[in-house]
Amino acid sequence: MRILYHHRIASKDGQITHIEEMVDALRALGPVVEIVGPDVHIADTGQGGSAGWVGRLKKTLPGVLYELAEAGYSLVAYRRLRAAIRAFGPDVIYERYALYQPAGVWASRRTGIPLLLEVNAPYALARRKYNQLRLGWLADSFERYTFRGADRVFPVTQVLGDMLVAMGVQVGRIRVIPNGINPKAFEALPSTEAAKACRGLADRLVVGFIGFVREWDQLDRIVDWLAARPARDPATLMVVGDGPVRPALEAQARRLGIAHKLVFTGVVPRHEVPAHAMAFDIALQTALVPYASPLCLFEYMAMGKAILAPDQPNHHEVLRRGIDCDMYDPHAPGGVESRLDALVADAALRGRLGQGSRQALTDRAYVWEGNARRVAQAATELARSSAPAR
């Protein structure tokens, strides 16, 4: 089995982690995998950020021109993809969906090679929500065309799968494959106590968050919650990562007199993230879009952390309230704060939820190897069915 993996990622964050882990897992199963993507060099800086020239384009070009440039890049991507097909001779094309990126569909229709499409988000909807879309009609058209043109579509949640069906994708073409973890990355980690001690947090109760913090994560609410607690309360917010709202959060903490209760590690290499996050007593999953499958959620499970997550459908696909997580209403005033109060006050509950989250990960096999097996199986089926026509 020969798989040509096509993507348009130019950042070193959870997206590239997904690509690297899936490719490694596929190769470990036997398929030969070739990757084709943008010609950019990205250092292993951890979470967040875009390659320099991409970031500059986003900042300097007006929105309409940037989106036209995205659409225009699909022609470049198509030529690269066709060249890779000629050189590599794949049995299938595996593409990570990106907005304004129909190159995989074009190549598949031109060559007869089946296309497997991984979908992490309906990006036209996502960018429209945050006012980052100017050519909505064009984006919607590209998106529907790409989704409907794939032979197999792999959404990361059933919520997203249902959205694809509403866009016209045939149910029989959809296979839900959530994110996962590489168990080897979570071997030989320090204990929670040791991880705290290494970071000067030995006497703290750590509420933790992994990621590139943005405004919609609403960590300002957590800072306010910390400030409202007694002065000698040990609760502390630790962010393993960085983000554009870090200066505002740090200024808020200083203004409230709790600067010592807010800890940012800054950007760290991805392979070092688990060792830092082992300091968490409570792992916070912030309110995201209802179709996402956040990588950090599975990382929290692998570390056996007490998870506090928003009560929304995509999380119910993975977690069970009171068994392997606690949940809060992301829309209710005081929703996350009241559940944090309960978890801080109940060490036994934190222990039970942490054990439950680790067991759930094991029982349901949220690992890259399992995901790769499902992709390889679909690839084999499609390659066999298309062979006579090629």
List the model feature ranges, each with a label:
Residues 4, 201-226, 238:
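Conserved donor-binding/catalytic core segment of Leloir-type glycosyltransferases
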Residues 1-43, 390:
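N-terminal subdomain of nucleotide-sugar transferases
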Residues 247-271:
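Nucleotide-activated donor-binding/catalytic signature segment of Leloir-type glycosyltransferases, i.e.
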Residues 321-322, 326-334, 342-348:
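Conserved acidic donor-binding segment of nucleotide-sugar-dependent glycosyltransferases
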Residues 159, 180:
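Carbohydrate-associated surface elements
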Residues 79-83, 102, 106-109, 134-155:
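Membrane-proximal helix-turn-helix segments that form the acceptor-binding/catalytic region
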Residues 342, 349-364:
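A short, well-ordered alpha-helix in the C-terminal region of glycosyltransferases
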Residues 217, 271-275, 281-301, 309-319:
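Nucleotide-sugar-dependent
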